[in-house]
């Protein structure tokens, strides 16, 4: 079963600190790579909710590969598991490559909506008048549909000017487009996909392929957090990392305390 892993980050505001978070941090639960289906049941999701519930997260994000296949998927059990934690800002999800591999991306997204998640596919929403949440379609979309996903610039093209000072949180299943996210002004990018290799020696492959294969990477005011995943793919076995549920605690500070552009890169497991 997964363990709860904590991350603390500081976001430096270009304008006023969101009023809801002047005296308290924003708490975000993060679940990725659950791979629900024939091998992993809603029981693992229920256990994940039980880990998060005492922390009282403001929102929970499901960053792709929540569904592995549609065999033995139980909507009632999945909805009941979600209900064990009721974040005031909701449950939000984006697709991963396995929502496509499962056979029908539309069927997968309909299932997530039916059990109580709000789905974002190359869309943004304003959350609590405090931050902008952008959910990206999976990077592997062209291989399944023949069409490209939207660029982050295009996704945010209709974001009103009065919201552009607010922190931008991006959900992107594969942690490949870090430079694009940073250039778009992203404060926090949440990803999964890598499983940190899941089995030795594949962790070395993820180290070579991704700038951030697992953990927290900070560059100035940009933070990338990659989860090793809450479930498993294929054999229910891990040798390179524990299955994990994340709690990301976000502290907002005023602009006059912002880091310089040349702030050195920081990496945490």
Where are these regions (language model features)?
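Soluble catalytic domains of enzymes that build or remodel membrane lipids, polysaccharides, and related
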Residues: 5-259, 269
């Amino acid at each position: 079963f997964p363990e709860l892993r904590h991350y603390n980050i500081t976001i430096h505001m270009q304008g006023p600190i969101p009023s809801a978070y002047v005296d308290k941090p924003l708490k975000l639960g993060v679940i990725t790579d659950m791979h629900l289906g024939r091998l992993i049941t809603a029981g693992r999701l229920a256990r994940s909710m039980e880990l998060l519930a005492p922390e009282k997260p403001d929102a929970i994000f499901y960053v792709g590969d929540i569904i592995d296949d549609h065999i033995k998927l139980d909507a009632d059990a999945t909805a009941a598991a979600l209900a064990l934690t009721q974040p005031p800002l909701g449950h939000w999800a984006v697709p991963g490559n396995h929502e496509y591999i499962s056979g029908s991306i539309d069927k997968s997204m309909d299932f997530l909506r039916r059990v109580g998640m709000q789905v974002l596919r190359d869309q943004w929403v304003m959350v609590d008048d405090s931050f902008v949440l952008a959910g990206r379609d999976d990077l592997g979309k062209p291989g399944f549909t023949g069409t490209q996903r939207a660029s982050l610039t295009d996704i945010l093209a209709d974001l009103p000017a009065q919201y552009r000072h607010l922190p931008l949180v991006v959900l992107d299943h594969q942690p490949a487009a870090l430079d694009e996210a940073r250039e778009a002004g992203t404060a926090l990018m949440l990803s999964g996909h890598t499983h940190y290799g899941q089995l030795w020696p594949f962790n070395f492959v993820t180290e070579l392929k991704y700038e951030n294969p697992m953990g927290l990477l900070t560059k100035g005011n940009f933070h990338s957090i990659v989860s090793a995943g809450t479930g498993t793919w294929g054999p229910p076995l891990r040798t390179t990392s524990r299955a994990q549920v994340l709690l990301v605690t976000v502290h907002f500070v005023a602009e006059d305390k912002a880091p310089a552009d040349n702030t050195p890169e920081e990496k945490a497991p």
